[in-house]
């Protein structure tokens, strides 16, 4: 039970309790959620979260839509290969200045250890990488290059 997250509802049968009430009580009193939400970290948590301990020499940055059309910029450690501790930062939106502000919460010594960052062709992503990771080499994502090449071949094929 210690290794895997469980819901309060799954405890109903074992302990003869109201699972929904238990979850509410846990959130309000036991978890420290209210204190965290009022802390310096919790104040900006709805806009961005940064995990400096997950940073590594090889990062990737991309935007994605998680829910309801909201775009997020996500910076991941490539060496973690999508497993635990792979997210370095997640920022609501793709505006360069907002993402740069969030990434600058990571100490510059850690950011300067990044040697390579993979990104797409977006100009805002280039600006983010240039400002937040000045010593990192920027590598264009293979998917975007393949798409450009296929589009060019398609144009030539149609023209002839």
Language model features with spans:
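Conserved beta-strand -> loop -> alpha-helix junction used to position metal-binding or nucleic-acid-contacting
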Residues: 120, 129-160
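Secondary-structure boundary/capping positions in well-ordered alpha/beta enzyme cores
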Residues: 18, 110-113, 135-136
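RNase H-like nuclease fold core
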Residues: 23-128
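Short, well-ordered alpha-helical segments in soluble proteins
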Residues: 15, 26-37, 153-160
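A structural signal for short, well-ordered beta-strand segments and their strand-loop junctions
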Residues: 11-12, 60, 118, 138-141
């Amino acid at each position: 039970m210690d290794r895997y997250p469980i819901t309060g509802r799954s405890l109903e049968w074992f302990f003869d309790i109201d699972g929904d009430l238990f979850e509410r009580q846990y959130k309000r009193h036991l978890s420290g959620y209210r204190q965290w939400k009022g802390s310096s970290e919790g104040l900006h948590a709805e806009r961005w979260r940064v995990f400096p301990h997950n940073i590594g020499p090889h990062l990737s940055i991309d935007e994605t839509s998680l829910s309801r059309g909201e775009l997020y910029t996500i910076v991941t450690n490539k060496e973690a290969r999508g497993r635990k501790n792979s997210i370095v930062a997640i920022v609501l939106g793709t505006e360069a200045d907002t993402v740069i502000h969030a990434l600058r919460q990571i100490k510059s010594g850690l950011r300067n250890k990044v040697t390579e960052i993979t990104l797409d062709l977006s100009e805002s992503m280039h600006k983010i990488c240039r400002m937040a990771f000045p010593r990192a080499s920027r590598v264009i994502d293979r998917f975007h290059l393949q798409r450009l090449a296929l589009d060019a071949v398609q144009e030539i094929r149609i023209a002839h």
